[in-house]
């Protein structure tokens, strides 16, 4: 097999001159010095050729060890996230759900890129764009392992390998749509590293695309975010095993996701439409505002080791919220739902009080129908006008390790809470 190389940065004149200077006193001729230099050069090239060939031949195709799962789904796009066992370049192929075989024709490809350059790594985030609202699409994920030669900036690839669409059906998902008559989603929170309970309450027998439009985790899915492995084992892997390859998953950060050595990387695994921990979702004429309440204690509390600045973060978020509630999407929605992990309380802990001070006055002007929270590890329903919360809309706190099924109809919002013991709470709220 021929090996072609492009060698740069070698100055043969310098090498010959140096050899001539060192050996001149020994009486060697210029021809002999040139011969020695060329022999060394050829030996070097041969060694590089053998090493490169061996390395390239030894690259194994990557394996997917986490994911894929759907993030940041909207009416025209969604993002697919997954992890491979080695550095790779990645892409997603997408086909309409039109009854043809996936191999019927070349499918549109979308690549993991940043500023125009393909990303080499183990985590892959591919945004699929230009889609139709309320439409089902099939997709597959593909990878090629990469070996980098840093001196020459060369890449050597393994054979490409993708999710199986020959023996198995491709992954299937559906975009959101404002034309949906009813919105159905499931919410969970405060599982605190209990993947077995998560899989029980959000099993694939329960969470299906026909029953649910999306799933939302409302914070504290882990207790302290110490490592990537913990996040995968406690949240990502059980979600993928049950529903997340085909039902969109959204995340609202809780105060416990802000803690731990790996906390700053949390949204590397859960990209959002805004690139921030706060964002919006629009589906079926319902406008969702997902907020981040930050930590529950003051920034200077000894528990945070001087690593947090959530007071300023919440102020920035409040400025964003002012723009959001005045947007046409919010004003023209038939219903408005706010998601935040920590509930507001003017007399509560610092985080609760700051949420009440900064967010509630803005939301009170936005005709909000319902706020959904977690954090307190028990069920609580606060009526509109509650003096402690200060809101002119009802607030529901979902218990820890429970699933809340929410259905937004034409004139009311119905929710049912189910815990691991199959105990249920049901209630309904009129839409303004």
Protein language model features and the residues they cover:
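Active-site-proximal segments of metal-dependent phosphoesterases and phosphodiesterases across multiple
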Residues: 304-305, 310, 328-371
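Active-site environment of divalent metal-dependent phosphoester hydrolases
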Residues: 193-197, 223-226, 253-262, 296-300, ...
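Acidic/histidine-rich helix-loop elements
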Residues: 103-118, 148-164, 186-202, 223-226, ...
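Conserved, compact domain cores that house catalytic/ligand-binding motifs in diverse enzymes
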Residues: 181-258
């Amino acid at each position: 097999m021929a090996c072609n190389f492009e060698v740069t940065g070698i100055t043969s004149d310098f090498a010959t001159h140096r050899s001539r200077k060192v050996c001149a006193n020994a009486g060697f001729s210029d021809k002999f010095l040139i011969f020695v230099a060329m022999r060394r050069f050829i030996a070097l090239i041969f060694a590089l050729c053998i090493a490169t060939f061996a390395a390239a031949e030894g690259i194994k195709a990557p394996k997917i060890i986490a994911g894929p799962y759907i993030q940041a789904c909207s009416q025209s796009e969604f993002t697919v996230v997954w992890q491979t066992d080695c550095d790779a370049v990645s892409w997603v192929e997408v086909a309409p759900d039109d009854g043809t075989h996936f191999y019927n024709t070349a499918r549109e490809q979308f690549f993991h890129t940043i500023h125009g350059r393909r990303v080499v790594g183990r985590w892959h985030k591919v945004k699929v764009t230009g889609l139709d609202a309320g439409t089902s699409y099939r997709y597959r994920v593909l990878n090629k392992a990469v070996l980098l030669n840093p001196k020459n900036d060369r890449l050597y690839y393994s054979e490409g390998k993708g999710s199986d669409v020959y023996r198995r059906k491709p992954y299937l998902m559906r975009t959101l749509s404002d034309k949906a008559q009813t919105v159905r989603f499931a919410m969970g929170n405060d599982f605190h590293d209990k993947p077995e309970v998560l899989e029980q309450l959000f099993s694939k027998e329960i969470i299906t695309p026909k029953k649910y439009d999306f799933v939302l985790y409302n914070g504290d899915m882990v207790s302290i975010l110490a490592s990537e492995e913990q996040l995968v084992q406690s949240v990502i892997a059980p979600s993928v095993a049950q529903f997340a390859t085909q039902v969109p998953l959204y995340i609202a950060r809780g105060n416990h996701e802000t803690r731990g050595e790996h906390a700053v990387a949390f949204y590397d695994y859960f990209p959002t439409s805004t690139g921030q921990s706060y964002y919006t979702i629009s589906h079926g004429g319902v406008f969702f505002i997902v907020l981040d309440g930050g930590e529950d204690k003051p920034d200077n509390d000894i528990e945070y080791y001087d690593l947090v600045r959530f007071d300023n973060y919440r102020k920035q978020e409040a400025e964003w919220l002012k723009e959001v509630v005045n947007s046409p999407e919010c004003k023209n929605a038939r219903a408005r739902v706010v998601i935040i992990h920590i509930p507001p309380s003017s007399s509560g802990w610092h985080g609760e009080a700051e949420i009440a001070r900064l967010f509630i006055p803005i939301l009170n002007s936005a005709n909000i129908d319902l706020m959904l929270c977690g954090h307190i590890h028990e069920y609580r329903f606060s009526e509109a006008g509650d003096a402690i919360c200060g809101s002119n809309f009802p607030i529901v706190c979902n218990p820890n390790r429970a699933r809340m099924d929410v259905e937004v109809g034409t004139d009311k919002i119905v929710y049912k809470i189910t815990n691991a013991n199959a105990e249920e709470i049901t209630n309904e709220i009129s839409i303004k």
